[in-house]
A protein has these predicted regions:
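Conserved phosphate-donor/acceptor-positioning beta-strand/loop module used by diverse small-molecule
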Residues: 56-77
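Catalytic-core regions built around general acid/base machinery
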Residues: 27, 49-56
Length: 177
């Protein structure tokens, strides 16, 4: 809620994955049965969906987005609501924020590729800060946000294998071969 998932999807993923499926299990199951590539936007990473997709022959990718502080998300949602956007219970945002962060370490175990973005407002927009391939950290920015450091700690220090500052594009998506 308020991390910038829809903005990133609209700007970078919509063309490749026009089928954005809501978190409704029967729609996800139908897409898997039909072997359609699709994207899913949710607050937490659905590891069961990732496993089902892998079992069905999909290559799975998670695009995870967070901010430094859930109060930033609250502010974004208030602005969206003031402009006629969806009304949300603001009191649930801090808990949802923490739940989302807790899902990231599990996501790396269940997805083929995990791209991690920070969207803390600093004039940079969505900033790729880490990447995991098959559970292994392969890229990390030299200026990791504190929320990422809290999750992965020492693993981030000196573990980047493919470069210091990754470049590129809270969505998880699966794509069929």
């Amino acid at each position: 809620m308020g991390a910038g998932k829809t903005t990133l999807y609209d700007a970078h993923l919509k063309e490749a994955f026009p089928d954005l499926i809501p978190p409704i299990s029967h729609q996800r199951e139908a897409a898997l049965r039909e072997q359609r590539s699709f994207a899913v936007e949710d607050l937490v990473v659905d590891t069961e969906l990732l496993e089902s997709a892998r079992d069905a022959g999909y290559a799975t990718k998670v695009v995870f987005i967070s901010t430094e502080d859930p109060n930033l998300n609250v502010g974004r949602i208030l602005i969206r609501m003031a402009h006629g956007g969806q009304s949300l219970p603001l009191s649930t945002i801090p808990e949802s924020y923490e739940e989302s962060l807790r899902s990231l370490p599990e996501a790396r175990k269940h997805a083929d590729d995990v791209l991690v973005y920070d969207n803390t407002p600093d004039g940079k927009g969505h900033r790729l800060v880490a990447r995991f391939i098959s559970g292994e950290l392969v890229r990390v920015t030299h200026s990791s946000p504190d929320w990422l450091k809290r999750l992965f700690g020492r693993e981030l220090c000196g573990r980047s294998k493919r470069g210091n500052e990754p470049r590129g594009q809270s969505k998880s998506y699966v794509k069929s071969h």
